[in-house]
A protein has these predicted regions:
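Conserved, structured core segments of small domains
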Residues: 1-239
């Protein structure tokens, strides 16, 4: 079974503080073990809200808000990893995507690269990787979007792939099939789905191919220990 586990931003990451190298290496070693087993399919960390852009679509119009800002409707329906030259290029694609959706919200978050966290020096003129987060709505949380919208999104994704912009995309099943994990000093509270939008921004994610919910919960528990024992994690099934 494929799951996406999403950890939420905390005050330190939102402030742009660099994680200690010991933490980076410990988490890398832990997650790297699953990569060697073929269980880690994807993953990325996102920058603080000051590196993000929120696009809200209402009545055919798009409003744009650049960070920093607080979280509000943080429940994804799908994610698209884009490789672009500039943020404006990503915004242009996001506006086309949002026009298909109608009323809705999209967030663009810069992906943290190894040089952003001090692992290696930056290469010359690196491309910009942006995670496009398509926020859930009543349709995606129920029966899904219309066949017309689904076909139009698929056609746009094909165009983005041909343009060398879309690296990969994932669709998530409704939150009714997921769980929200609230860790407080390594004490876990589990909230079964469906659940409402989180008010905490997504700080990063990993996509795992594991035996089931029990295994992904054990992975989340260990990640929480490494990250200090107090954080929020959403676990969602991947289509």
């Amino acid at each position: 079974m494929k799951f996406m586990m999403m950890h939420k931003n905390d005050p330190k990451t939102e402030a742009g503080e660099m994680p200690p190298m010991e933490l980076v290496h410990e988490m890398g070693q832990f997650i790297g073990g699953y990569a060697q087993q073929g269980k880690l399919l994807d993953g990325a960390g996102l920058g603080a809200s000051k590196t993000r852009t929120r696009l809200t679509f209402r009545n055919g119009e798009a409003s744009v808000l650049h960070g920093p800002y607080a979280g509000q409707h943080e429940l994804p329906a799908s994610t698209l990893l884009l490789k672009v030259a500039t943020r404006d290029e990503a915004m242009a694609w996001a506006k086309r995507y949002g026009t298909i959706l109608g009323d809705g919200e999209i967030e663009l978050g810069k992906v943290n690269e190894p040089w952003d966290i001090g692992i290696m020096p930056p290469p010359p003129n690196p491309p910009l990787q942006i995670l496009l987060i398509d926020k859930a709505d009543a349709a995606t949380e129920a029966t899904g979007r219309t066949a017309e919208k689904t076909a139009a999104i698929a056609a746009l994704k094909d165009e983005m792939t041909q343009a060398g912009v879309l690296v990969r995309s994932l669709n998530l099943q409704p939150s009714a099939k997921g769980k929200r994990l609230l860790f407080t000093q390594n004490v876990l509270q589990v909230i079964d789905g469906p659940f409402s939008e989180s008010k905490e921004l997504i700080g990063g994610f990993a996509v795992m191919d594991v035996s089931g919910m029990d295994e992904i919960l054990e992975i989340c528990k260990r990640c929480a220990e490494i990250l200090g024992g107090t954080l929020e994690v959403d676990v969602r099934l991947v289509e």
